[in-house]
A protein has these predicted regions:
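A Zn2+-metalloprotease active-site environment signal
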Residues: 4-6, 13, 18-159
């Protein structure tokens, strides 16, 4: 009986947590509120930026900011035109270039984007960088961080 009760609770939790990704409509499970994810990610982002060496490459920083602002504006325009403006209500875009030779970038929930200098060695134009930044922005808009946390919680509790 205890096992059946546990399964019913898990089933109800899963059903109540089902959602859809804006734009694509792909189904996802979000067990943690957007606000909880945002609060946690802003803390992590702040700690990361305190310890990360910010790049002194002025032209690289300008490129990251310029491209990031264009991607953010296009994202906002698209979501607004499709009645999805609320999806960005917790976003405050920020674009940073850090001194690191990794060929990588990441975007935290809320629109906090970090590009590593190593990536700029491969991106010779705004268009090339826009592909990467657009990809990172898509992760944030689709709430992939929340989805990943939810999947980890399910795994942790054996669902």
């Amino acid at each position: 009986m205890k096992k059946i009760t546990s399964l019913l609770i898990i089933a109800l939790l899963l059903l109540s947590s089902c959602g859809s990704v804006p734009i694509t409509g792909r189904k996802q499970i979000l067990l943690v509120s957007d606000q909880e994810v945002l609060t946690s990610s802003l803390t992590q982002y702040s700690e990361y930026m305190k310890s990360a060496p910010v790049s002194s490459n002025a032209s690289g920083k300008n490129m990251v900011t310029r491209v990031g602002k264009k991607i953010a504006a296009a994202t906002e325009q698209y979501l607004k035109a499709n009645g999805l403006s609320a999806e960005l209500s917790n976003f405050s875009w920020e674009f940073n270039l850090v001194k690191d030779n990794q060929v990588n970038a990441f975007c935290m929930p809320g629109g906090k984007i970090v590009v590593y200098e190593g990536l700029l060695k491969l991106c010779s134009s705004d268009d090339e960088l826009a592909v990467v930044v657009g990809h990172e922005v898509a992760h944030a808009v689709a709430k992939h961080s929340n989805e990943r946390i939810s999947q980890q919680l399910l795994t942790q509790y054996g669902a």
